[in-house]
Structures are given as structure tokens and as C-alpha cells.
């Protein structure tokens, strides 16, 4: 798959950063020495972490060279590492592991989340936000277009139910807070929904397509979006975007 496009991703910087700030607001740590931002992207979430803990050592982890270059340019006082989140291990336990809209791309959460908790210091926090929109029209329509055009379903899998996360993390000695927030983003058009998702959810479907096939996919996708997202009185469309939040504090080892 082609590398991520930071410019495309940041076209919707405010909308993407808002849940990152909401997640950060629920972390109770006051004294933090080391923070890790898993899937840091272009550094929009890392910037919030630096503002919250100006004296902490902050490390951003991503596997996109383009995203890491953007983040390093924006935040020269943070460390950025090209690494696989599933295999990442810090040199010493971490106070806060923060993952905003990144872990949904990884498989086998039943193995991944206990692995991440194991990297926390006692009283450390794992803070995670993941899009929970697998059943939203924005995503069901991707699968519909792929099926219509004879393409494989390359989208990510649905998230586990909240009770599964709760049991998984409490078994790891964590105190767990889980909630779900639905954002309603006013966007300029149905094309804007497509533009947003070309930076994230549509990427696996578009990967490897030639220009003609890509254009056919996106044209059909926007047609279907228009059927499912009515225009508001001011001509905008409201993109419903549910997100799942998990904050787990490690209180036992």
C-alpha cells in the first residue's frame, strides 16, 4: 500500500484532533516522565501531549515515513521512531501509552492490548480512541462498491464489544473506563466525506487500483453517499462518526 499522505490527512485536522483532545482530557496523570504516542501520524496528537506534559520525554511511533517526517518537523523536541506497534517494546516502563485512531488498523487485539499493558509502569495509563463506524453508511458503502465492482473487501474488521474490552483489561490488572461518543461533523458536500475517508478508511480499497478503476470506485461511492446523507438546510451534510474510547490504568502487576 502507498505511504500515507500527511497533507490529505490534515485537510480535516480540526475534526481529527477533537477526539484526540477528548481522550487526553480523561487521563488523570499529573506527574509523567515518559509518554508514547502510538500511531502518531503527522504529530497532531503528539502536539497535544507536549502541551499537557512540557517536561516529559515524548516518543511518537508510526510506520509511515511521510507522517514521521511531518511530525519531526513540527515537534523537534520529541523523538519519532519508525516501528511496528504490535512488536514495539520500550527500554523501560512507560507512564502513558496514548493511541488516537491507530489501533483499529491492527489485528488480534486480544494479544495486542495485554502486550501494551505490559509496557506500562504501575499506575501507568493506556489511553485509546478508535473509530467505531464499521456499520455506518460511510463504511458499509465502501464494502458495497467493492462488491459491485468485483473487488475484495480490504476494509478493517469491526471492533470488539465494550464488555470484551473491559474483561480483557481488568484481567491485566487495570481499572477501566470505556465510553462511546458520536460526533456529527458538518461537511461541505458528499465529496468532502469521500475526501476525508480517502485519507483513512478508503485507503485499503484504493490501493493497487489503476486511475480508471480508482475513479470509478470513488464516483460510485459519492453517488451512494448522496443517497444516505441528506443535505441540511444550509447545503451541508452531517457525517455521523462514532468513536470508542478506552482509558485503562494499571493498578496491579
From Swiss-Prot:
Record's protein name: Trans-aconitate 2-methyltransferase
EC numbers: 2.1.1.144
Signal peptide: none
GO biological processes: methylation
Stored InterPro entries: SAM-dependent_MTases_sf (IPR029063), Trans-aconitate_MeTrfase (IPR023506), Trans_acon_MeTrfase_C (IPR023149)
Pfam families xrefs: Methyltransf_23 (PF13489)
Alphabetical keyword list: Cytoplasm, Methyltransferase, S-adenosyl-L-methionine, Transferase
Family: Belongs to the methyltransferase superfamily. Tam family.
Superkingdom of the source species: Bacteria
Species of the source: Klebsiella pneumoniae (strain 342)
SS bonds (residue pairs): none
Chain's role: Catalyzes the S-adenosylmethionine monomethyl esterification of trans-aconitate.
EC class (word): transferase
GO MF annotation list: trans-aconitate 2-methyltransferase activity
Primary location group: cytoplasm
HAMAP family in the record: Tran_acon_Me_trans (MF_00560)
Gene Ontology cellular component terms for the protein in this record: cytoplasm
Catalytic activity of the protein: trans-aconitate + S-adenosyl-L-methionine = (E)-3-(methoxycarbonyl)pent-2-enedioate + S-adenosyl-L-homocysteine
